Amino acid sequence: MKDLTEKQEFVLQYISDTVREKGFPPTIREIGDQFGITAKGAYDHLKAIEKKGYIRTSKNQSRAIELLKGNADEALLVRASGIPLLGQVAAGAPILAEENIEEYIAVPDDLATKPGTFALRVKGDSMVEAGISDGDIAIIQKKDTARNGEIVVALIENEATLKVFFKEPDMIRLEPRNAKLKPIRTKKATIIGKLIGLYRIY
């Protein structure tokens, strides 16, 4: 592993050791915690290791990582990160900017392979009647337009909100799916994506 940096060697060995000992790989966040780096930093190390030929990722398998060098006898298949889970989304910044990313999460293959896919953690009960609960992970495909009736993520005054989209003659109407709450009517909402899936951890 002469072409890997010392940190990259440690990351590669940590993944291999974890799979051998536990039967499953560490998460991006666990890699970051292990080495005192951010989730994005851990992800960057994985991509650098891939470029040097030690691992191969497969986009149609939620970024499965196959170890190629020095591990042929183990034939390990490591499922690592899937899509970025965003924290606060700031107006004016690229939606997938590094500072927005909290960690990477694995999701079903048919969702992870869609271009521009990211995840947001649902806060509150404004969409509960649509089966979307507080704490759920909303899987979003990046888009700046929407059709009436689609569930979208819209940015309003630096706050991301998940609502049902409707276009009115002179404004946008964002409807909750909670009878206790009123629709939001605004001219200043920015559509950043539409809901394509929901991920719930029990």
Swiss-Prot record:
Q: Name one Pfam family in it.
A: Peptidase_S24
Identify the residue position(s) of the site Cleavage: A91, G92
Enzyme class, first EC level, given as a word: hydrolase
Example GO biological process: SOS response
| Superkingdom | Bacteria
Keyword Repressor among record annotations? yes
Recorded E.C. number(s)?
3.4.21.88
- Keywords tagged on the record: Autocatalytic cleavage, DNA damage, DNA repair, DNA replication, DNA-binding, Hydrolase, Repressor, SOS response, Transcription, Transcription regulation
GO MF annotations for this entry?
Answer: DNA binding; serine-type endopeptidase activity
What InterPro entries has UniProt attached to this entry? LexA (IPR006200), LexA-like (IPR039418), LexA/Signal_pep-like_sf (IPR036286), LexA_DNA-bd_dom (IPR006199), LexA_repressor (IPR050077), Peptidase_S24_LexA (IPR006197), Peptidase_S24_S26A/B/C (IPR015927), WH-like_DNA-bd_sf (IPR036388)
Name the reaction it catalyses: Hydrolysis of Ala-|-Gly bond in repressor LexA
Q: Which residues form the active site?
A: S126, K163
Q: What residues are annotated to bind DNA?
A: 28-47
Q: How does it assemble?
A: Homodimer.
Query: Which purpose does this protein serve, as stated in its record?
Result: Represses a number of genes involved in the response to DNA damage (SOS response), including recA and lexA. In the presence of single-stranded DNA, RecA interacts with LexA causing an autocatalytic cleavage which disrupts the DNA-binding part of LexA, leading to derepression of the SOS regulon and eventually DNA repair.
Concerning its family, UniProt says: Belongs to the peptidase S24 family.
Protein name, UniProt field: LexA repressor
**Gene source species:** Leptospira biflexa serovar Patoc (strain Patoc 1 / ATCC 23582 / Paris)
Gene behind this chain?
A: lexA
